[in-house]
Amino acid sequence: MKFIYPGSFDPITNGHLDIINKITSIVTGDNPVSVLVMNSDTKKHMFAHEQRIEMVKKTLKQHMPLFNVEGFDGNINDYIESQWPKYDVIIVRGLRNNTDFDYEMMYETFTRRFSAQTIYMTPSPENIFVSSSLVRNLINTGADYDDLVPWI
């Protein structure tokens, strides 16, 4: 079984790290989790793809070898099939609120067609409102965001 945790991580936040810490309780070093840093032409990113990959690698340094960080372009299902065709793949996703739930149900409907299963984890209460969008807004307005990101 292969666990993957995909996201744009633009930037990685304490909410992402919270989910990653929870993942460590269900996996072993025999089969590291692949953290997939997605790049999409349809999304406008604040940080370049390579920057986001490096941020995630720096953040997860303490958790290696439980995790490996990979970047990819394009469709998640195509990527899964090209990398792990003989594995049963489990996609890990974080859920904070009803908006996330609605989006994830649509996303799972798409990924389920490709036989990937999805498990959902919720962040700790102190991270329930932390999002990359919030951090980007704070960065753009010059507000303090240090307590929302692990890589400062």
What name fits each language-model region?
Residues 1-152:
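Nucleotidyltransferase catalytic core that binds NTPs
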